């Protein structure tokens, strides 16, 4: 009797031991699983990653060969991202560096104690590959400019080509209007250097009254280069020879050293003229040299 009972107990134990354990938690199907916190977090992460990919504009990447939108006064082919902006200050001191002896130059702190021609420029990316700018100097000249990329340098084409149009006027854009048209052609040598050739035409460059003017247009070919010396240090050079039309004085020429730090760029330059608009550059330079600087800031 005891053996029968023992066998019965063992049989029941084996029977219940082999039964599957039922979970009290409900089984989620695929739709329910997507609603769990872990799955929701994954979905949010994927959405953020997708948004980051969509916002990845190559125009926002640092261009080590062309870190700024100008050389000294001439424009470059650097693209400004859509709906982004940049700001630039130009400063040209009025004391000639060759005036007096060296001790006089030091006393005047290399021209920093003298008056200066100052300019402010705001640049905006209106569309992809299209930027607009307004530049005002402290002699109340205002220049408006629009620049459009036609072709970008790539493996199949060695040049970048931009076209631009400008209009400037004196007395806060009330008098002496000077429209201009030009082309910017550049070539980058890897990330070490960039060279430029910029033919452009400017009207109403002769400041004399119209009845005394035989030639009131200037055609120039701006030539420039930027060489990266170290990770963030550059040497810059440009010259703007007039090849036809009104061409008084000397061709405007500038050279300098430039330091880039993040979105900022500081350039110390030497030039034989004060001009920072196309009409001013068309009027040429002097036989003297002047110290100046540019400060620029990108807002992206």
State where each predicted segment sits:
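Bacterial N-terminal signal peptides
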Residues: 9-20
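Short amphipathic alpha-helical segments
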Residues: 220, 232, 236, 250-252, ...
């Amino acid at each position: 009797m005891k053996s029968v009972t023992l066998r019965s107990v063992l049989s029941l134990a084996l029977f219940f031991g082999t039964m599957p354990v039922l979970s009290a938690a409900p089984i989620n199907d695929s739709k329910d699983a997507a609603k769990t916190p872990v799955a929701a977090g994954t979905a949010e992460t994927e959405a953020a990653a997708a948004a980051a990919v969509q916002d990845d504009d190559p125009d926002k990447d640092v261009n080590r060969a062309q870190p700024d939108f100008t050389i000294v006064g001439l424009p470059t082919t650097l693209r400004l991202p859509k709906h982004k902006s940049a700001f630039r200050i130009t400063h040209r001191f009025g004391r000639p560096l060759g005036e007096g002896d060296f001790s006089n130059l030091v006393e005047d702190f290399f021209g920093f104690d003298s008056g200066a021609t100052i300019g402010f420029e705001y640049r905006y990316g209106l569309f992809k590959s299209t930027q607009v700018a307004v530049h005002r100097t402290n002699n109340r000249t205002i220049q408006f400019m629009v620049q459009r990329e036609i072709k970008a340098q790539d493996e199949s084409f060695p040049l970048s080509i931009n076209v631009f149009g400008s209009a400037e006027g004196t007395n806060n854009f009330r008098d002496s209007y000077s429209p201009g048209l030009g082309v910017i052609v550049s070539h980058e040598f890897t990330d070490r250097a960039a060279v430029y050739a910029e033919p452009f035409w400017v009207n109403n460059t002769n400041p004399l009254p119209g009845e005394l003017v035989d030639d009131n247009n200037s055609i120039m070919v701006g030539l420039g280069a930027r060489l990266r010396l170290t990770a963030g240090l550059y040497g810059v050079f440009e010259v703007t020879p007039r090849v036809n039309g009104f061409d008084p004085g000397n061709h405007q020429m500038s050279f300098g050293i430039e330091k880039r730090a993040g979105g900022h760029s500081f350039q110390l330059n030497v030039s034989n003229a004060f001009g920072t608009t196309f009409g001013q550059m068309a009027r040429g330079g002097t036989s003297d040299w002047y110290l100046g600087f540019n400060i620029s800031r990108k807002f992206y």
